[in-house]
Amino acid sequence: MEPIKNLPRLCRTLSYEFKNIELLTQALTHRSAANKHNERLEFLGDSILSIVISDALYHQFPKATEGDLSRMRATLVRGDTLTIIAQEFKLGDYLYLGPGELKSGGFRRESILADAVEAIIGAVYLDSDLEVCRALLLKWYAERLAEIQPGISQKDAKTLLQEHLQGFKKPLPDYQVINIEGDAHDQTFTVECRIEDLSQSVIGVASSRRKAEQIAAAQVLELLKK
């Protein structure tokens, strides 16, 4: 298997340092690229993500019904959410794809990106243990868990924008951090959102990258409605 570049940078982005880097390499390898691909790791990661998020929601919402807990979990672990997480990690830059998938833009394909997130979760579990994996996932999901509430619509602006573009078979939005100001504990992020249908770029500014992306996505949705 050919080496994948910049894995140390990806580890920093993921906030996890692999002891066995081959596990990360395998997690990033699509079945079109090699016999030793990421599907088994994806199977494992899917189960781990489900139990960690289920446990977090159970304790966070002691009065929520089973139905509300199920709907919130579905929102947090569904493919659209995993695709957005993959985009936040810029996983498309690190995927190992076969020539056909590479040529057809597989590094942008939602299902491939979502599967890679689950595979990385499986790889982290094998490289460490369930508690380390749980702590990492809760860090990845901290803002989403803080924002989610039972009994209300669970779709945020980024998800709604993504679904809108998918409905018209358009490419996914591109989010880029164009400026970070302030000290480490008090930063302001400026994020640019670009989509194929708009010639102009849209800017979101907030105290975290994800919040800035949500603001930019909401503004794009408003422009698309006009």
Curated annotation (Swiss-Prot):
Residues 7-129 form the RNase III domain. One of its GO terms (molecular function) is double-stranded RNA binding. Disulfide bonds: none annotated. Digests double-stranded RNA. Involved in the processing of primary rRNA transcript to yield the immediate precursors to the large and small rRNAs (23S and 16S). Processes some mRNAs, and tRNAs when they are encoded in the rRNA operon. Processes pre-crRNA and tracrRNA of type II CRISPR loci if present in the organism. Belongs to the ribonuclease III family. Homodimer. This is Ribonuclease 3. It comes from Shewanella baltica (strain OS155 / ATCC BAA-1091). The lineage of its organism: Bacteria, Pseudomonadati, Pseudomonadota, Gammaproteobacteria, Alteromonadales.
